[in-house]
Regions:
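An N-terminal assembly and electron-transfer interface module characteristic of large anaerobic redox
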Residues: 1-175
Length: 175
């Protein structure tokens, strides 16, 4: 025992090392557990959403939005080395963070699946989660990385591909 029993570890208490929930896994499954429309229900076709940067937290919103508009949502897979390697040729700078570099592979994956409409908005301001929050803006990379994708993934120059990357502030209900 620790002298004086002032340390909560010293009096014989042990942490429960079993049954510890993996909250990251729980959140990930909750965010990405939506089932897209079947092709016959998706009268407007498919929309591709890359599983990158700000699209993690906002995916439930965008999935619901496009599903209500009768699009079949195609989500890129979980990031891995193969996804990274798919987009490596279009990465313009080594100075970007790794999550941003992954975005190139996710968009390329969607294109290789035959998705002709890809939606990847630029979000400078996120929604206010609680009133005490004094700022809720994304870093400059997250805010505008879709512009980088648009200008560096050559396949997006194909006139049959629609790449939408509007600048939207989720704090403004008008947008």
């Amino acid at each position: 025992y620790i002298s004086g029993n002032r340390c909560e570890r010293g009096i014989g208490k042990q942490k429960n090392k079993e049954n510890i929930p993996n909250l990251f896994d729980y959140k990930y499954k909750k965010i990405f557990s939506y089932t897209p429309l079947d092709a016959d229900q998706a009268v407007r076709g498919k929309v591709g959403i890359p599983r990158v940067l700000n699209m993690f937290e906002n995916y439930p919103f965008w999935f619901t939005f496009f599903t209500k508009l009768k699009y079949q949502v195609v989500l890129s897979p979980t990031s891995n080395r193969k996804i990274y390697e798919l987009g490596i040729e279009s990465i313009p700078s080594e100075s970007e963070c790794y999550p941003a570099k992954l975005a190139h592979g996710h968009v390329t994956w969607l294109l290789r699946q035959g998705v002709k409409f890809i939606f990847y908005p630029c979000i400078p301001y996120e929604r206010t989660e609680f009133p005490e929050a004094i700022n809720h803006y994304n870093c400059p990379i997250v805010t505008s990385y879709a512009e980088n994708i648009k200008n560096n993934v050559d396949e997006l120059n194909d006139p049959s591909i629609t790449f939408r990357n509007p600048f939207l502030a989720l704090t403004n209900e008008e947008t």
